[in-house]
């Protein structure tokens, strides 16, 4: 994922897009009866550089728009093309301010920065250190204890959506786990979600545009899924909450899937103009039959944990109140089983399928690359990243 540039206040425009609208009423956060001076405005621009916490793409777009309105007035630039995601988002944000006077835009910019500075300082003091922040920015958390490698999707504020960097980090974590002395490898999620799947802003962050993102995405996805196909040790998913997209389709490559009764399983590929991945076009019909697989992969039916169990996607469902205790007690028992015996048994179970799975993965990635460049997919992604936030 491309990093956001923080070195200059006027560059508060996202390389990643999520929500592009912020009600103007929320901008009058400070001194409504006062007029910000030019010096106040310049001080605010300098203050932006010192923010310790990323305020999110929604706010960064608003800062960009207010800066442009305060310095140049209403937007008169031609509207960028539909495929120019970043510049179109910037244009939309600026144009949405209409005829807002320069003085008002300047005041709103100063007030918004002041509010962000206060929030950032309070957040830093509340956390009492940088450890939590470092874990949050890492994307995944990998721990090894008692014979278990635990890989946690660790972006709870983003519902554990998976970035390009997280794909690479998971590949590395699995390669390390395949050769270390742990016995089983477990995936779970931090917070309320297991994972909301692929971070769609992966497609809007590539500097070379959609084609570069599609090419990179196909390569990374192919290696990512192959790593799961080839993983030699028992692989267990502890699905603590809603799972979406690739976090669901991957489950067909796991050896056991334990779910909380509050978990749901959703593969909205058609809604996004995309197609199945992670070998689900093969594993899902094999597990649940063609009709039930089509309900999920074609029509985007969301399954409850009980429904997923009935269709063979989930091994066992546990009550939310006892989920963590029951599952981890069981996993600690599994980790004491003879490791070589489990490796050999898994190889016997999976070996006849490996060649087929690699072929399916190759075909799915090739198809997905084409879908990502299709008008249907691009329109769906644009609709997603420009949607209004839920109140």
UniProtKB/Swiss-Prot annotation:
Amino-acid positions noted as binding an acyl-CoA in the UniProt annotation, renumbered to this chain: 64-68, 90, 109
Site note Important for catalytic activity, residues: 277
Annotated positions of the N6-succinyllysine modification: 49, 53, 60, 68, 79, 88, 90, 127, 159, 286
Reaction equation(s) it catalyzes: a (3Z)-enoyl-CoA = a 4-saturated (2E)-enoyl-CoA; a (3E)-enoyl-CoA = a 4-saturated (2E)-enoyl-CoA; (2E)-tetradecenoyl-CoA = (3Z)-tetradecenoyl-CoA; (3E)-tetradecenoyl-CoA = (2E)-tetradecenoyl-CoA
Keyword terms, alphabetized: Acetylation, Isomerase, Mitochondrion, Peroxisome, Phosphoprotein, Transit peptide
Phosphoserine PTM positions: 99, 117
Location of the motif Microbody targeting signal: 389-391
GO annotations of cellular component type: mitochondrion; peroxisomal matrix; peroxisome
Subcellular localization(s) per the UniProt record: Peroxisome matrix; Mitochondrion
UniProt superkingdom: Eukaryota
UniProt pathway annotation: Lipid metabolism; fatty acid beta-oxidation
Ranges where the ACB domain occurs: 37-122
Gene Ontology terms: biological process: fatty acid beta-oxidation
Stretch forming the signal peptide: none
Chain spans, region ECH-like: 149-319
InterPro entries: Acyl-CoA-binding_prot_CS, Acyl-CoA-binding_protein, Acyl-CoA-binding_sf, ClpP/crotonase-like_dom_sf, ECH/Chromodomain_protein, Enoyl-CoA_hydra/iso, Enoyl-CoA_hydra_C, FERM/acyl-CoA-bd_prot_sf
Molecular function in Gene Ontology: delta(3)-delta(2)-enoyl-CoA isomerase activity; fatty-acyl-CoA binding; intramolecular oxidoreductase activity, transposing C=C bonds
A Pfam match: ECH_1
Main localization, broad class: other
E.C. numbers: 5.3.3.8
Family, as annotated: In the C-terminal section; belongs to the enoyl-CoA hydratase/isomerase family.
Name used for this protein in its record: Enoyl-CoA delta isomerase 2
UniProt organism field: Rattus norvegicus
Lineage of origin: Eukaryota, Metazoa, Chordata, Craniata, Vertebrata
Underlying gene: Eci2
